[in-house]
């Protein structure tokens, strides 16, 4: 992989900048962490060299000063909202985040339930956390939020919210996903702190858009593609341009809400410490790009992947035409085409040649391998075996799993487990491969190559079953699929 981002420089520069911001506010700073605090795979894809846990590692350098508050919306609890990248609900992710933070030596002070209006599911979640010894606080729905600043910044507004008791100079506000109420949490806390005579401050840590890259830079366009469902739009920060005469990039929600935030700061603090949304940020990522062309190309590839994801969502009923059209426009702005993703034409050509669903994968050395549908294997399972053989230097004509070993598994699926699809999925072929590895050197060599699949690109000529999608995700393979089902059915399950 070509490197475009200096991760070590980023860790050092980012932690130093946050320390400076803490010092500007009398040693008490509420830091809103946008995006993912760890598992930031989007950043690692568009900034090659950025580690998915970079922000967490940076925070660990501040561990003696920091405590974490995890925010979750009562509405998201009520709707059982799911993290698309992990396939778990937001409330389960709160517990996962707590485990991850504490296992790294970071202090999690409490959980804050926002947008609370008596939801029974939120009450049950609160009780569940309290039984685990976790402190839980609530932020209530405020009428007229966010425009009625006089009411919001009063004892009847923020004053009704619980006050989170914190003990450290840096309070990191994070959440399972966007729209959880992180900024509202920070402002509510500032209100309570000033009531108590503590002159705390607020800052925002948002990796994207990168404020000191051009508006239409592919890295920033890739962020728009990633948030197409939220209808976020990158724009020039007009407040920063007016205050300093300098062009910087922010996104529409922060720009639109800034006059309101500014008014709230003035009511809470007496004056607003910031002249623009850009001023509120502490992100140093743009200063750590060491090869701009590498990051541009990685971002163009990300937009293509997001396009396929939006098309799949549209076909399955969970996406919208607007989302697809927006990403099509972003592809044009980034001067990218779907055929720039090498595995796309390879998979489609294989489908045409075999007259059945097919798949292709680009290996770390750039070589493309393909898989086709057969009586024994689905295209994805065949692709996986072919990729492992290629990585291990095994002749493609050699069976690493005997067909005689596959037939009993097919019989188990169809005769005893009620499946109508006899072909093996990825997880099933991996189990068969691991069993064969006990007696076959070739199978063992193939199995040992599994870690080398991480980061590989794959494309299939049809949409896959959930079981194969999840398997690719677990293997770390970046998957895209054509937006069509293998067979036209009202109810798709294989």
Q: Which residue stretches match the model-derived regions?
A:
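Flexible, solvent-exposed loop/hinge segments and secondary-structure transition points
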Residues: 392-393, 414
């Amino acid at each position: 992989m070509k490197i475009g981002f200096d991760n070590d420089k980023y860790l050092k520069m980012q932690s130093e900048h946050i320390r400076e911001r803490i010092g500007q506010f009398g040693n008490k700073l509420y830091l809103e962490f946008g995006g993912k605090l760890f598992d930031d795979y989007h950043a690692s894809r568009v900034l090659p060299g950025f580690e998915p846990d970079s922000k967490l590692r940076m925070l660990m350098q501040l561990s003696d000063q920091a405590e974490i508050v995890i925010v979750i919306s009562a509405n998201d609890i009520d709707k059982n909202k799911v993290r698309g990248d992990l396939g778990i609900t937001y409330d389960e992710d709160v517990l996962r985040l707590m485990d991850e933070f504490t296992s790294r030596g970071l202090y999690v002070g409490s959980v804050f339930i926002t947008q609370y209006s008596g939801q029974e599911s939120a009450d049950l979640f609160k009780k569940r956390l309290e039984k685990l010894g976790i402190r839980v606080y609530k932020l209530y729905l405020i009428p007229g939020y966010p425009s009625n600043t006089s009411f919001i910044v009063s004892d009847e507004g923020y004053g009704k919210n619980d006050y989170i008791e914190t003990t450290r100079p840096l309070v990191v506000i994070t959440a399972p996903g966007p729209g959880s109420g992180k900024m509202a949490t920070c402002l509510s806390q500032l209100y309570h702190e000033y009531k108590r005579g503590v002159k705390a401050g607020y800052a925002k840590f948002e990796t994207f858009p990168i404020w000191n890259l051009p508006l239409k830079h592919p890295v920033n366009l890739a962020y728009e593609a990633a948030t197409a469902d939220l209808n976020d739009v990158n724009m020039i920060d007009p407040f920063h341009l007016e205050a300093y005469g300098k062009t910087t990039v922010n996104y529409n929600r922060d720009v639109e809400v800034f006059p309101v935030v500014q008014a709230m700061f003035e009511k809470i603090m007496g004056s607003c410490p910031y002249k623009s949304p850009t001023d509120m940020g502490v992100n140093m990522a743009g200063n750590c790009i060491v090869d701009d062309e590498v990051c541009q190309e990685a971002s163009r590839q990300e937009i293509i992947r997001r396009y396929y994801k939006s098309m799949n969502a549209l076909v399955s009923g969970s996406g919208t035409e607007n989302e697809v059209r927006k990403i099509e426009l972003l592809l044009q702005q980034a001067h990218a085409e779907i055929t720039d993703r090498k595995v796309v034409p390879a998979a489609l050509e294989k489908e045409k040649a075999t007259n059945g669903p097919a798949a292709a994968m680009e290996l770390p050395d750039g070589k493309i391998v393909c898989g086709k549908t057969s009586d024994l294997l689905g295209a994805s399972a065949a692709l996986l075996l072919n990729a492992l053989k290629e990585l291990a230097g095994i002749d493609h004509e050699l069976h690493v799993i005997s067909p005689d070993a596959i037939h009993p598994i097919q019989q188990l699926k169809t005769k005893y487990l009620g499946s109508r699809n006899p072909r093996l999925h990825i997880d099933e072929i991996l189990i068969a491969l691991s069993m064969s590895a006990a007696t076959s050197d070739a199978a063992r060599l193939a199995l040992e190559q599994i870690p080398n699949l991480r980061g590989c690109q794959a494309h299939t000529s049809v949409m896959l079953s959930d079981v194969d999608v999840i398997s690719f995700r677990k293997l770390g393979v970046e998957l895209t699929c054509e937006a069509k089902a293998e067979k036209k059915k009202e109810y798709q399950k294989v």
